[in-house]
Each structure stands twice: as C-alpha cells, then as structure tokens.
From Swiss-Prot:
Protein name: SUMO-activating enzyme subunit aos-1
Chain segments annotated as coiled-coil in the UniProt record: none
Pathway: Protein modification; protein sumoylation
One GO CC annotation: cytoplasm
The UniProt record lists the keyword Ligase: yes
Length: 343
C-alpha cells in the first residue's frame, strides 16, 4: 500500500525530509504501544503525525484523577475517571490524523499466557512497552528478538526517565565515503600529484543490539571498563536501575517515605557496582521523593520525543539509529546516550 496523493499533501514536509520510500514504509507499519500514561501520549502523538497505518493502544487501567491535567490527550471538560487511559485519548488521536487506524485494547494483554502473548505480538512492525515492570518488559523483548520485531521500552520515574532500543538484525543507512574522481598527474620532478573528490554516501548496514536484560545488567568490573566508568556511566543510570530493581523485587509499597527507605540500599549497591562514589552523586537520598511522582512533564516530553524519533527512524530504515539506552534527568536537564554493555 503506497501513500496516496491526498496523503502526500498532508505529509509533504516530512516526505521532503526523509523521502517517499521512507514514508511508504511508515504508511505500511503496524505499531503496538503498551502503556497509556504521559510517556505513551508523547509517543502516540508522534507516530500518529508520522502517518503509520495502524496503532494498537493497550492499557486496561482507568484514568487517575491526577492524570487529567497532566496528559494532553485527555479532554478535561468531561469525566475521564470512568474510562481506560487510551479510551480517554481516542478522540484527540483520531482528530490528530484520521488516516491512522486506531485500535483500543482495554485488557491486560501481558497477563495472558506466553503463547498467546507471542501470537499477538508477531503481527506488529514495532512494539513499544512503556511504564511496565522489569519482568514484563524483558518478556516482551525476548519474544520480539525471537521474531525479529523492532522493540522499544521506556519509563518515567518522577523527574527521570529512560528509553531502551533493540533493533537487532535490522539494516539502516550509515555514512560511507568513496572516491568520486581520481586524477593523477606526474610532475616534472617525478612526484605524483593526486586529486581526490569525496562525496558522502550512505550504505545499508545490519546492526546488532543486546537485549533489555543484557543492557540493564551491564558488568562494569573489567579493568578497561573500570577506568572509564565515571565517563561512560551517567549518575542518573543508578537512579533508573534502582527504581527498576525496587519494582522487580516488590519493594515499592506506594507510600513514598517507606519506598525511599527501601530504595536507598539498592541505590548504594548500584553506585558501587558502577564504580562511582556516593558522595559524588548529584542526586542524594534527600531528593528521592522526586522519583515518585507526579511525573515531571518535560521529562516525559524529552524521553517521548527520543522514542518517537527512533521509532520513525527504525520503521523507515533511516540513518544510523541510536544504540541503545537513553536516560534523561530533569534534575540537571540533561540527556545521556549509553552504549551498554560497555566494551
């Protein structure tokens, strides 16, 4: 299915940016987004504007009252509290781009047995898992790797957030320099004069990506890694990893004071494992309350923007995707791109 003339008029600017071939690939893509909170809203908006063929939006949870003023997809003039998160977002997304087919799934798809989950995931071009537990994210990632499906995950923890990318085995454009013209002239002295004109070209290259589990359990003990840990491992990584671990180990109760107490020893362990020192961490435990919400809007916007960018790049097989863990911290208004496990 190719982009119609009517769609060409709608997508004219982005077609000028990445070309008709890329837009056709986007037009034929089917995307699954699991998780309809702030981060999901940012990603869904970007992919809707890009013009994917289908977006399947999964979330069985009802809208929380505190979310209504934080999620721009919700209509604050109506009572959203009795609706599931994506159902409350439907009208905004439908009117944003009516060429995109929207499918709202109001059930907990990841609670099904493994064979049912696997069968469900195989029909998608890209799977995006947001604000989910470590175990569920890892399970979906393993299935996607098995079936060669592009995978992205991410989460927001108050003022910090992360995005993980796994495009293992997919090909993308990378820069390649080749001589366009070679002209050699012999001078009277016998020396060779060489004139070379180099044009910048792009070639397809297949990329290898580590899994979610491999990335989030990076080993920093190798001697050559220890020496450069303070340079390649951002301090915000330890906050993200600690939150993932606390959730995985069922340490979080929903009571912020208690959760901070449970988080501190985990954070201490992660900082030590990353060859950093506690006293050099810019975010100390007295600020850990910022990790438990409400989520910081600019953090969701930054992480969601990067996810949307890489999703489009991945689907369209564009230029050189990021590899492989992006972390944003609202404490310092800084984003870090990590290539983990480090080599």
């Amino acid at each position: 299915m190719e982009v119609s003339k009517a769609e060409q008029a709608i997508y004219d600017r982005q077609i000028r940016l990445w070309g008709m071939e890329a837009q056709n690939k986007i037009r034929n893509s089917k995307v699954l987004i699991i998780g309809g909170k702030q981060l999901g809203a940012e990603v869904a908006k970007t992919l809707s504007l890009a013009g994917v063929d289908e977006m399947h939006l999964v979330d069985h949870r009802l809208v929380d009252t505190e979310e209504i003023g934080m999620n721009f997809l919700y209509d604050a003039s109506v009572d959203n509290s009795k609706m599931t998160k994506w159902a409350a977002s439907y009208n905004f997304l439908y009117n944003l781009n009516r060429n995109v087919k929207l499918f709202i799934v109001e059930e907990d798809v990841l609670s099904k047995n493994d064979s049912e989950i696997e069968e469900y995931l195989t029909k998608f071009t890209l799977v995006v898992v947001l604000d989910e537990s470590y175990e569920r994210t890892a399970k979906v990632n393993n299935i996607c790797r098995k079936h060669h499906i592009r995978f992205i995950s991410g989460a927001i923890y108050g003022w910090i957030g992360y995005a993980f990318f796994d495009f293992d085995g997919h090909a993308y454009l990378v820069k390649a320099k080749s001589p366009d013209c070679l002209n050699e002239e012999e001078s009277e002295t016998g020396k060779t004069s060489t004139v070379v004109t180099v044009d910048e070209e792009f070639v397809l290259e297949t990329f290898s990506y580590p899994s979610f589990v491999e990335t989030l359990n990076s080993d920093f003990t190798a001697k050559k890694i220890v020496r450069k840990c303070k340079r390649i491992v951002p301090t915000s990584y330890f906050l993200v990893k600690s939150m993932l671990r606390a959730s995985s180990e069922n340490k979080l109760t929903g009571v912020t004071e208690n959760d901070i107490e449970k988080l501190i020893p985990i954070w201490n362990e992660e900082v030590a494992a990353g060859n950093h020192t506690i006293d050099m961490q810019p975010v100390q435990p007295d600020r850990f309350d910022h990790l438990f919400g409400p989520n910081f809007g600019p953090t969701a916007a930054c992480v969601g923007g990067v996810i949307g960018q890489e999703a489009i790049k991945s689907i369209s097989e564009g230029k050189n995707p990021l590899r492989n863990l992006f972390i944003y911290t609202g404490f310092e208004s800084t984003g870090f791109m990590c290539n983990f496990p480090p080599v």
